[in-house]
């Protein structure tokens, strides 16, 4: 089993060119699946049947995985078996006919425009704060994913025309505009970046000069949110959700927001229409004379 896994890691790394973060996630999922199989006396991928795939999901649920995590585990396993079929290691994909547990639809959390203003209202001249403010401004102004922002290089960004070139999911490149506040914040950061003795072309570097890691960016946002008195936990995804929600509230152009977010399917973007409708419903309930609820 390990031999096929090692070949798969090389395939993901070299041919698919997945990010180290994605590769680590795949490895974590599949190694846990190997453990479940080994605990039940199954030592080859050829022995896995659809019923065993369902057993893996049931055992994963006992381990505490919820619907979304179970769907992810099934997706990873299904893709691995697709690879094994292509390599002629197995004849059929046993995960093809297995359905993931139905997920409850959770609306993504965002912060409102006033909270964004509160978040970014900091004119500290400390180099680390200048860097963090540039990260925040760019995340909110462009709706980038954490992985997209973390992988940016100096040549990815053009502050003159206010555009950033992004490599998104599936190695799909897109050009995303950003606003003048983000442009100004990035220019201020570029002036002091040299103080961090950068070791490569990464746009955002640590105080040791290395490219900021995913976790470091998450931690800096948490610290910034607390420092600025935000009432809720701050993370990169929340800024992405806020970008999408505020764009839709202002323009209602779902297709444009889809392009900006880098969603391959419109259905992924449509969850933000539910948020937008929620906002409209609240306005209606508070404003329409025939909609006000009895106390």
From Swiss-Prot:
GO biological process assignments: cell division; chromosome segregation; DNA transposition
Record key words, sorted: Cell cycle, Cell division, Chromosome partition, Cytoplasm, DNA integration, DNA recombination, DNA-binding
A cellular component annotation (GO) from this entry: cytoplasm
Active site: 145, 169, 237, 240, 263, 272 (o-(3'-phospho-dna)-tyrosine intermediate)
CDD domains the UniProt entry points to: INT_XerDC_C
Residue ranges constituting the Tyr recombinase domain according to the UniProt record: 106-285
Places the protein is found: Cytoplasm
Taxonomic superkingdom: Bacteria
The Core-binding (CB) domain, residue ranges: 1-85
InterPro entries per UniProt: CB, DNA_brk_join_enz, Integrase-like_cat_sf, Integrase_catalytic, Integrase_recombinase_N, Integrase_SAM-like_N, Recomb_XerC, Tyrosine_recombinase_XerC/XerD
One Pfam family cited in the UniProt record for this chain: Phage_integrase
GO terms, molecular function: DNA binding; tyrosine-based site-specific recombinase activity
Similarity remark: Belongs to the 'phage' integrase family. XerC subfamily.
SUBUNIT field: Forms a cyclic heterotetrameric complex composed of two molecules of XerC and two molecules of XerD.
Biological role stated in the UniProt entry: Site-specific tyrosine recombinase, which acts by catalyzing the cutting and rejoining of the recombining DNA molecules. The XerC-XerD complex is essential to convert dimers of the bacterial chromosome into monomers to permit their segregation at cell division. It also contributes to the segregational stability of plasmids.
Protein name stated in the entry: Tyrosine recombinase XerC
Gene name linked to the record: xerC
């Amino acid at each position: 089993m390990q031999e096929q896994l090692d070949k798969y890691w090389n395939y993901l790394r070299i041919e698919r060119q997945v990010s180290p973060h994605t590769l680590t996630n795949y490895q974590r999922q599949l190694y846990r699946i190997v453990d479940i199989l080994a605990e039940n006396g199954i030592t080859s991928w050829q022995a896995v049947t659809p019923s065993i795939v369902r057993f893996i999901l049931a055992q994963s649920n006992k381990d505490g995985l919820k619907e979304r995590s179970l769907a992810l585990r099934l997706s990873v396993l299904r893709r691995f078996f697709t690879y094994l079929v292509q390599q002629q290691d197995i004849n059929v994909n046993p995960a093809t006919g297995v359905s993931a547990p139905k997920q409850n639809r959770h609306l993504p959390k965002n912060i409102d425009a006033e909270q964004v203003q509160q978040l970014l209202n900091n004119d500290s001249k400390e180099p680390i704060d200048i860097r963090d403010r540039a990260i925040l401004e760019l995340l909110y102004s462009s709706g980038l994913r954490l992985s997209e922002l973390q992988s940016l290089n100096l040549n990815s960004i053009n502050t003159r025309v206010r555009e950033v070139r992004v490599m998104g999911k599936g190695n799909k490149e897109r050009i995303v505009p950003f606003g003048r506040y983000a442009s100004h914040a990035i220019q201020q950061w570029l002036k002091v970046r040299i103080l961090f003795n950068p070791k490569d072309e990464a746009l955002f570097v640590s105080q040791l000069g290395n490219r900021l890691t995913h976790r470091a960016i998450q931690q800096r946002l948490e610290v910034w949110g607390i420092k600025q008195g935000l009432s809720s936990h701050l993370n990169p995804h929340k800024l992405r959700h806020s970008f999408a929600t505020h764009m839709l509230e202002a323009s209602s152009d779902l297709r444009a927001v889809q392009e900006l977010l880098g969603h391959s399917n419109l259905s992924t973007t449509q969850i933000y229409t539910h948020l937008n409708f929620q906002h409209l419903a609240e306005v209606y309930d508070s404003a329409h004379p025939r909609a006000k609820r009895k106390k």
